[in-house]
Amino acid sequence: MAQKLEAIGRGLQWDDSSDHDNVTKILVRGGREGIQYVKFDYVKSGQPQTGLIHGLSGRGGFTQTFEIDQKDEHLVSVEGYYDVTKGVIQALKFKTNKKTSEMIGYDDTGIKLSLEVKGKKIIGFHGYAETNLNSLGAYFTTTGPIGLNPQVGHIKLAYQGGGGGIPWDHGPNHNGVKRVSFIFDENEIRQWRVDYDDGGVIRQYEPINGYDMFEVKEYPTEYIISVECTYDDVIPRSGRRMIRSIMFKTSKGRVSPIFGYPAARKFVLENNGGALIGFHGRVGAGIDALGAYFSSFIPSPPPPSPEKLQPEGGEAVGDPWDDGIFNGVREIHLEDGEGIALKFVYDKDVQVTELKVHGEPSGIGFNEFKLDYPSEYITTVEGFWDKTSGNERGVITRLRFTTNKQTFRPVGLESTTSFSLGKEGYKIVGFHGNSSTDKLHQLGVYVVPITRE
């Protein structure tokens, strides 16, 4: 099933749907007021699909196209800028696994938008439009359990075992193997069934109900990387060699039971951690020989788990609060009066989230610090806290934020005790703390390792 990144906006809703194989051509029409319309062409089951215009044509401006070679190229992300006042997308930029378009449009200011899911490709668009393009969302699907199209990047390992029976081949055009079922006796693997993931649809080969089954529990983040087989003569010195046992290993270190009865001769099918995406071999009364298709690329490691750093400041008085974990921080809003009040604007899967104020605003007005998200992120927060009259258990009096690109000016007053939040090699993706009705007492952060994009 395709993953849908939502688009919310004014105008009329449109939806190209998620049942395409790939995006092949993009047409963008723009003018001074923003993007006037977009049109996307697709391929579905090998056949070209011409898309509809979303927006209004027939006005002055410019038209640009961006073409994608469906043979070995796919769309991975879209970036752009959105004018909140006009409610119109101002510019768009498209990126495939091979190339990136220029920023299409006149205005590269406003809120930056990004449509991207790591390890997935875009197969459809939806959004809102009227006289202009008001918003844009996308449908994503896996390009294989390792983030590539298995039809493009795979290797075929020759079958091994006996020479009897007839050849068979399931092919490499699958995302991965979900489960395998077996019927076997003391002499051979007699029958089996392989359940492949074909773009979210489970396709079965050899429709039997096996006595024993191996299932990849956490597919698609877990996948088979190794198949170990043994084979030998079914009858001693008969020369009729058959596969006698099979065992699997996964990307998360799990090892299956041995299916069948091990024999003396052994071989292993694997490709340096690549994902198993298909089988072939020879078959007669049982499985005579077995070979496999593996992805020719190594998967990227899964995203790191966030780490919660304990809050700093005074005592844990008032009410605890927790903004949660996000992809990153877009804006910081700080106000200083008798203490610090703050709020953050976050990004979570392209959705902008502005959370409530922590601490009581004094009415002076917030200082706003905007990050160049997603390329800019917070690395450290430095601050001071103190015990004051009426706040003997401590309040935060000053904060200063540092990113990978700059250090923002501090807000508030220095006091007796300083603190620092952050971790070397990590970025901040969320905040938590303690505050009462009018004071911020403690501040803590969530961090994740900085990875190369």
Curated annotation (Swiss-Prot):
Q: In which tissues is it expressed?
A: Expressed in roots.
List the SMART domains hit by this protein, alphabetically: Jacalin (SM00915)
Recorded protein name is Jacalin-related lectin 40
The keyword Nucleotide-binding is assigned to this record: no
Listed GO biological process terms: response to abscisic acid
Gene3D superfamilies this protein is in?
Jacalin-like lectin domain
Recorded hits in Pfam families, A to Z, give: Jacalin
**Family, per the entry?**
Belongs to the jacalin lectin family.
Q: Which species expresses this protein natively?
A: Arabidopsis thaliana (Mouse-ear cress)
**Residues that bear N-acetylalanine:** A2
All residue ranges annotated as the Jacalin-type lectin domain in the record: 1-142, 154-296, 306-449
Q: Identify the keywords attached in UniProt to this record, alphabetized.
A: Acetylation, Lectin, Repeat
Q: What induces it?
A: Up-regulated by abscisic acid and abiotic stresses. Regulated by the microRNA miR846. Abscisic acid also represses the expression of miR846, thus increasing the accumulation of JAL40.
Recorded GO molecular functions are:
carbohydrate binding
